[in-house]
Amino acid sequence: MIEPDTKDWTWVLDEVCPDCGYAAPEVDPAGIGATIRDNAQGWLAVLAQPGATERPDPATWSPLEYACHVRDVNRKFTERLHLMLDQDDPHFENWDQDATALASRYDLQDPAVVGPELAEAAETVASLYDDLAHAGEQTRSRRGFRSDGAAFTVDSLGRYHLHDLVHHAHDVRDFVARATVAAYDGDAAAYRDGTWELNDGVRAELDWFAGAVGPGGAVLEIGSAGGRDALALEERGLRVRRTDVTPAFVELMRSQGHEADLLDPLTDELGGPHDGVWASACLLHVAREDLPLVLTRLAGATRPGGALGMSLKEGDGEGWSTHGHVRAPRRFTYWREEPLRAALAEAGWRVEQLTHGVGGNGQEWIVTRAVRC
């Protein structure tokens, strides 16, 4: 049985949410609409996954039920924004989300229907936030009152609304990860063929890594994909354990005569101690709150003095993207130098060099050379 949520969540307007990491004071009002659209794209991907209608336990909503709630949240906040813009100091009718879930039978709704409904509701409210992004202070300070007396301005309502969406995406983060794996699964061969050529930047990192590991060194490769980098490392005299979280990539490598393991660095046994870990352009799919643990686990599987070669996309926040050789959306986490350095140090890595670069499509990257402390 689902336990009703009776908490007053207005504190998230002033404090960082310890569960999902949402920081309302840092939200740029001009970006709320785009974030809501990105959130909706994620729910479409989640609802397409097998098992999305199943509850992980009797007391927790299924991804489908969360999606129904997010759809209705977007509709409700559209309604409340219009009230605040059209009336002076309106009072919102009480909305019991748990009663709504039961009355509407969220558990029996069709994901193929809920997804488009959620996307439509998201676009409607996102467009409204877009229109308000550059509104004057008088408009942004218009007030509305919840039935319990809690007061919101147009500005604070948007920040409060966004937390609800971010938090529930966090609630189904396992399905978010599955959706990204499924995207690669669907286009594994196309991705391998389209990314097979090494560029000069990657060659330079491979050369450094091979020198740091030493001849004959044992390497754990995370995210081997089609096996391009593993071959390059072997050509440089290293022994490589090929791994990937995507089943289709593992099958591709095995079909080419290589041993390869299906492995999730967040949860699976890593073996070791290895002389080095190569993780090029793969840990960018790891959720922000999970990367410190992954880095710690990789350090634990590496001998002292062993090397880490890693590259991540540079930027802020997270987002879904459909680009390149993979047709379905994938979830990316973007990093800045300072928090990345802190995560590496806390995990037991000493940064030897951290450089910033720009890829062929204009994407900024952070490339890290580190050594196990």
Regions found by a protein language model. Give the residues of each.
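Short, contiguous alpha-helical
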Residues: 1-14, 51-101, 123, 130, ...
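Terminal targeting/low-complexity segments that flank the catalytic cores of oxidoreductases
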Residues: 1-38
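A glycine-rich, hydrophobic loop/mini-helix early in the fold
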Residues: 34-61
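Acidic/histidine-rich alpha-helical segments that form the ligand environment
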Residues: 38-39, 43-47, 100-142, 161
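Class I (Rossmann-like) S-adenosyl-L-methionine-dependent methyltransferase catalytic domain
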Residues: 177-220, 225-272, 289-293, 297-300, ...
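Conserved acidic residues
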Residues: 275
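A conserved beta-strand element that flanks and buttresses the S-adenosyl-L-methionine
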Residues: 278
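Short catalytic micro-motifs in class I SAM-dependent methyltransferases
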Residues: 281-285
